[in-house]
Structure formats: C-alpha cells, structure tokens
C-alpha cells in the first residue's frame, strides 16, 4: 500500500478510481481528481505547499513533485501524462499536456494546454511553453 502521510494538518485526498502503486509516497497538501494513476517509486511532496492534480492524470515511475516553501505550488490539469523519472518543482502543467521521461520543470514554469515537453528536457523557472507547442524537438534547456 502506498505511503499516505499527513503533514502540517494536511492529509492527501483522492478521487474515485485512483491507482496508487505500493511504494508511492503521497505526503501533505495533495488533492487529486478521479481516474488518476501514481506509479512505483513516485513521490508527491505537499509538505511545504500545495499540489493539485486534475482528473485522468498519470504520473509514471520514479517521478518527484515538490514545491518551494510559501512561494510555489504545483497545478496539473486534466488528462496530463508525466513520464518516468520526471521532476516537477512548483510548476503548472495545463490540460492534455505530455511531459517526456527524464524531464525537469522548475518553479513558476507553465506548460500550456496540449503542449509536449520532449524527454530529457530542462524547463527553467518562469518559462512559458505555449499551448500545443512541442519544446524542444531534441532535449536541451528551454530558456525563458
């Protein structure tokens, strides 16, 4: 069974039909919609600020979602796919976006609706990826 842990008076909340892998860790101020899947060795750390996840989201193995104390939150829209070993730190991912395996998305970045972040990408703080953009075609740093 996944580790579900209350922190600072916040207990994670989940919608209907969510799959939580046995060794996933969901901590603190995390709210997730229905029909989501959180895969093996994934960590959702809502210990210092909030994480909000829409409906139909899948976050694959080994990913880490965390925020910056009192400065950034994570908002993930509906029907988003987050690949294996992704780090999202205090960013916003809009509906229907895809974050490729091994990518890192930093504080206050915004990935637009339907946008694709290629595997291995680094999306720097405050970067805005427009809706339906594919950034980049090959992995490299995306600069604001």
Q: Model features per residue range: what roles?
A:
Residues 1-14, 19, 41, 47-64, ...:
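Glycine-rich hexapeptide-repeat left-handed beta-helix
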Residues 27-33:
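N-terminal glycine-rich anion-binding loops that anchor highly charged ligand groups
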Residues 81:
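Short proline/glycine- and basic residue-enriched helix-capping loop/turn segments at helix->loop/beta transitions
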């Amino acid at each position: 069974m996944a580790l579900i842990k209350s922190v600072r008076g916040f207990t994670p909340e989940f919608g209907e039909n969510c799959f939580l892998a046995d060794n996933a860790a969901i901590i603190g101020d995390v709210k997730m919609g229905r029909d989501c899947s959180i895969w093996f060795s994934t960590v959702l750390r809502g210990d210092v600020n909030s994480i909000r996840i829409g409906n139909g989201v899948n976050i694959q193995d080994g990913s880490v979602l965390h925020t910056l104390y009192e400065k950034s939150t994570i908002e993930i829209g509906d029907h988003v796919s987050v690949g294996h070993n992704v780090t999202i730190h205090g960013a916003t991912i809009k509906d229907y976006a895809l974050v490729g395996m091994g990518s890192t998305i930093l504080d206050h970045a915004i990935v637009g609706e339907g946008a694709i972040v290629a595997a291995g990408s680094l999306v720097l703080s405050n970067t805005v990826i427009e809706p339906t953009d594919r950034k980049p075609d090959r992995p490299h740093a995306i600069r604001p």
